[in-house]
Design a protein with these regions (language model features):
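Predominantly late transmembrane helices and immediately cytosolic-facing juxtamembrane segments
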Residues: 3-32, 45-55, 204-208, 215, ...
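Interfacial loop-to-helix junctions that mark the boundaries of transmembrane helices
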Residues: 24-30, 55-66, 94-99, 124-133, ...
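Interfacial helix-loop-helix linkers and transmembrane-helix boundary segments
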Residues: 26, 57-58, 82-99, 121-126, ...
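Transmembrane alpha-helix boundary signature
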Residues: 45-57, 76-92, 109-131, 152-153
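Short helical (or helix-break) motifs at transmembrane helix termini and adjacent helical loops
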Residues: 80, 110-111, 134-168, 176-182, ...
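Entry/N-cap segments of selected transmembrane alpha helices
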Residues: 84-116, 193-205, 304-321, 344-351, ...
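Hydrophobic alpha-helical transmembrane segments in multi-pass integral membrane proteins
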Residues: 111-116, 183-187, 236-241, 291-303, ...
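Functional cores that coordinate and move charged inorganic groups
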Residues: 150-254
Length: 419
């Protein structure tokens, strides 16, 4: 007689198999930096299919995601820039770190010119004063796409070397946003009674970070919670984005790089691990924050377009890209230097990546205009600027740079660093 075995563990086996598949899918998304575009795609579909529920959801999560969770992302961005401008970094010498500064100014100037020409052609004089919108660069989006293109997947987060394109474009993006903030400063009214208290808090934050560094505190928690908390509060009181709170704090955290004459010194001093430990521990949490960032901010109704929409898109994706490339070319011709592994083909990809205005362009637009049809046009244009990151990805494939480079060039950065 045949014996039939009845399995009683099949629900558990099925759940384990499903969990493994989900784990593999999540690992693939984090390894290839897909969580941000996934969140943005969900938001875009959701906003156009069920706008009421989406915008209700967005209002609830906007502040904790944009101003708290994103502080972690900007902290990692500051870490990238700080390490590469410190001794031993790809942008350490002034002849190198001034190049992205010049590129930022050139990009903003070209974008402003393109914006003004298009608006003049369309005879929309009311839009002339809104040109600072094209100065905004979404640092988080730029960080995501540049990391996805130039950072080879695999390996532990703390063990990876950054391609110099990453700190280059981040420094460029930060400089462009500083230009934008300076231009809109007269329009950005902050209550006078807030300014004094915020300045004291920021001074206390920087003093705390300096004291921690001076006393060789190697744990990053005091830097984040104490100094970072004071900085966050100062920016919140002042009315700026508190998500930028860690930008002035991370440079005080001990980092891993050393001057060449100290490379073979005693390694028992663990102070240099602080910044690297911070990146290693929070790398995947930052990707989760980017997913929520895309989910909360990328939903837009595909209506309300006009001259402001196309002027913003043309100026940012076209004008700024060309301006950055020209600025880098002029800087190099004047005797400044690109990092060893950065050539003009990489600069072209970086320039396209830097065309994503998104949240900073939205911020500048809402500062310059009251609610109305013109503001709606500009906001839609700002929300469409991430098309630049798609163009950057395609350009990287076409030009064979970053992860699309031939095998012989994939390790070029490591060779230059080791030289």
């Amino acid at each position: 007689m045949a014996t039939h075995v009845i399995r009683t563990d099949w629900p558990h086996a099925t759940s384990h198999a499903t969990a493994r598949r989900l784990s593999r899918a999540l690992h693939f998304c984090t390894r290839h930096y897909l969580l941000l575009p996934l969140g943005a795609a969900i938001a875009l579909v959701w906003a156009n299919l069920a706008p009421f529920s989406y915008f209700t959801f967005g209002r609830v999560l906007a502040f904790p995601v944009n101003e708290i969770a994103m502080a972690l992302v900007f902290g990692l961005i500051a870490q990238e820039v700080y390490e590469e401008t410190a001794p031993g970094g790809a942008l350490h010498q002034w002849r190198r770190w001034t190049v992205p500064m010049i590129a930022a100014a050139s990009g903003v100037a070209a974008a402003a010119a393109a914006y003004g020409i298009y608006v003049e052609w369309k005879i929309e004089t009311m839009l002339h004063v809104t040109w600072p919108v094209v100065a905004g660069v979404d640092v988080a989006l730029v960080y995501f796409i540049t990391k996805a293109i130039f950072q080879r997947p695999g390996g532990a987060a703390g063990a990876r070397r950054s391609h110099p394109a990453i700190p280059f474009v981040l420094l460029l993006a930060l400089a462009a946003n500083v230009i934008g903030f300076i231009v809109i400063a007269p329009s950005y009214v902050v209550a006078a009674e807030r300014t004094g208290g915020a300045s004291v808090l920021m001074a206390a934050a920087i003093a705390t970070a300096w004291w921690l560094r001076r006393h060789r505190v190697t744990e990053f928690w005091p830097y984040i919670w104490v100094a970072g908390g004071l900085s966050w509060t100062a920016l919140y009181v002042e009315g700026f984005h508190p998500a930028l709170a860690l930008l002035p704090i991370v440079p005080f955290m001990p980092h891993a790089r050393r001057p060449l004459d100290e490379l073979f010194a005693d390694d028992s001093d663990v102070r240099g691990r602080t910044v690297r430990h911070f990146e290693h521990l929070w790398h995947y949490h930052a990707q989760a924050a980017l997913f929520l960032f895309g989910l909360v901010n990328a939903g837009v109704m595909l209506t309300g377009y006009g001259t402001g929409t196309w002027a913003t898109l043309l100026a940012v994706v076209g004008g700024r890209t060309v301006g950055i490339v020209i600025g880098v070319w002029l800087a190099v011709a004047a005797g400044l230097h690109l990092p060893a592994a950065l050539r003009m083909r990489e600069v072209t990809v970086v320039a396209l990546a830097a065309s994503a205005g998104f949240t900073f362009s939205l911020f500048f637009a809402t500062t310059l205009l009251p609610a109305g049809p013109l503001l709606a046009e500009l906001k839609l244009g700002a929300l469409l600027t991430p098309v630049g990151i798609l163009l950057a990805w395609l350009a990287a494939r076409l030009l064979r740079v970053g992860r699309f480079a031939r095998h012989a060039h994939v390790h070029a950065y490591g060779k230059h660093r080791g030289a």
